[in-house]
């Protein structure tokens, strides 16, 4: 397997994050750098701690530990259709993630 965002052990990855209950840093969804807990069950992004809910969510696969909002978090897809459940969603790519996002879309 190619060394990419799916290679476990990376401390940081560029991921797709969609707030199913509202906005995320002024957009419905964002693509940006995240870090993980040592157990890989918590994703950290923009000061938020998103805990994996393992199929117990209604619309998402992670929940914000502080606000209770549900999130859909996934890897970057080459075709760009990262939105969960085929929804029309506006996505903003963080400035510091643009180069890596383009590389991932080409390699995927």
Where are these regions (language model features)?
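Mixed-charge, low-complexity intrinsically disordered regions
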Residues: 1-33, 40-42, 46-108
């Amino acid at each position: 397997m190619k060394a990419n965002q799916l290679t476990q052990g990376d401390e940081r990855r560029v991921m797709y994050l969609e707030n199913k209950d509202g906005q995320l840093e002024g957009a419905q969804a964002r693509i940006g750098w995240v870090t993980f807990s040592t157990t890989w069950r918590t994703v950290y992004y923009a000061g938020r701690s998103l805990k994996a809910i393992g199929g117990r969510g209604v619309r998402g696969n992670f929940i914000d530990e502080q606000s209770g909002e549900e999130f859909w978090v996934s890897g970057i897809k080459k075709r760009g259709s990262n939105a969960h459940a085929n929804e029309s969603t506006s996505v903003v790519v963080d400035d510091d993630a643009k180069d890596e996002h383009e590389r991932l879309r080409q390699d995927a």
